[in-house]
Amino acid sequence: MQFIKEIIIKAAPERVFAFHELPDAFERLIPPWESVKVVQRAEISEIGSETIIKSKVFGFFPVKWVARHTKYEPPRMFEDVQISGPFKSWRHQHIVLPHESGALLRDEIEYEPPLSFVGKAVAPIFIESKLEKMFAYRHEVTRKWCEAL
């Protein structure tokens, strides 16, 4: 399955990419309604570095999520993949492209939900809506930082 979210940011692509390189960028992008604890933070410029978080699925079921950085191509793209966590598979590309108004930030996620056919059946209701809300928040946080002078 695939999820894509885009936003136009009135800032240079280099600035948008630089936001993601901030030491606390990941923490800034966690929505306040999410119960997430960062156990280990990755350095996006280090291929193979891992972020480890603990969260709760549906607010109840604890889950440990390990994501490894697999690509780093500044100032255009970096990628992380789930090593272990709530999905059967997860690949997230963070893409920054030049745009006439500044930069286009595009998040592309390819994932396989848990629970096989049941997971695929409920993905549009539970997973897609959660991703939409979360990435709307993340993009707004990124936009505000990048457009601030």
Give the positions of each predicted feature.
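Generic structural detector for well-ordered beta-strands
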Residues: 6-10, 37, 54, 68, ...
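Hydrophobic ligand-binding cavity/cleft-lining segments
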Residues: 1-47
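Short, surface-exposed coil-to-beta transition loops
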Residues: 2-4, 62-66, 89-92
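A short, structured loop/turn motif at beta-sheet edges
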Residues: 13-14, 44-46, 71-75, 95-104
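Beta-strand elements of well-folded, non-transmembrane domains
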Residues: 9, 57-59, 71, 86, ...
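Beta-strand/loop substructures that line and gate deep hydrophobic ligand-binding cavities in soluble
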Residues: 81-133
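Hydrophobic pocket/interface hotspot
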Residues: 15-20, 26, 51-53, 69, ...
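Glycine-rich portal/gate segments that line the openings of hydrophobic small-molecule binding cavities
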Residues: 38-84, 137-144, 148-149
